[in-house]
UniProtKB/Swiss-Prot annotation:
Gene Ontology cellular-component terms listed: endoplasmic reticulum; endoplasmic reticulum membrane
Lineage: Eukaryota, Viridiplantae, Streptophyta, Embryophyta, Tracheophyta
Family statement: Belongs to the cytochrome b5 family.
Keywords, in A-Z order: Electron transport, Endoplasmic reticulum, Heme, Iron, Membrane, Metal-binding, Transmembrane, Transmembrane helix, Transport
Protein name: Cytochrome b5 isoform B
Length: 134
């Protein structure tokens, strides 16, 4: 294996994103899968949607057979420059601000929720008594 593998940038590989010229990146290797598009069991859309990015996760998630992995070697064209692949950023949800609410307003609301219906009931009873005696 005296041959030096050609090194491609992700930008260069991304230019090959059509059905007549389709390259993908899997495990740091670049493959020209144009001739395989029609034969791919998942259809050509699967491969075309994997262009322009590191498709390793897409490839591994499907669970390809050992024969599929061996078949890939015939489409090998070089290596990807790892510095051109964007780093995967782990999503961290934004921190929720801590609200230091005044407990007094909460207490007043609960008190009013109790007193207002009680006052309405008292008013209704008072009107009833007043109209009966009058």
């Amino acid at each position: 294996m005296g041959d030096e593998a050609k090194i491609f940038t992700l930008s260069e590989v991304s230019e090959h994103n059509q059905a007549h010229d389709c390259w993908i990146v899997i495990n740091g290797k670049v493959y020209n899968v144009t001739k395989f598009l029609e034969d791919h069991p998942g259809g050509d859309d699967v491969l075309l949607s994997s262009t322009g990015k590191d498709a390793t996760d897409d490839f591994e998630d499907v669970g390809h057979s050992e024969s599929a992995r061996e078949m890939m070697e015939q489409y090998y064209v070089g290596e990807i420059d790892p510095t051109t692949i964007p780093k995967k950023v782990k999503y961290t949800p934004p921190k929720q601000p801590h609200y230091n609410q005044d407990k007094t307003s909460e207490f007043i609301i609960k008190l009013l929720q109790f007193l207002v219906p009680l006052a309405i009931l008292g008013l209704a009873v008072g009107i009833r008594i007043y109209t009966k005696s009058g």
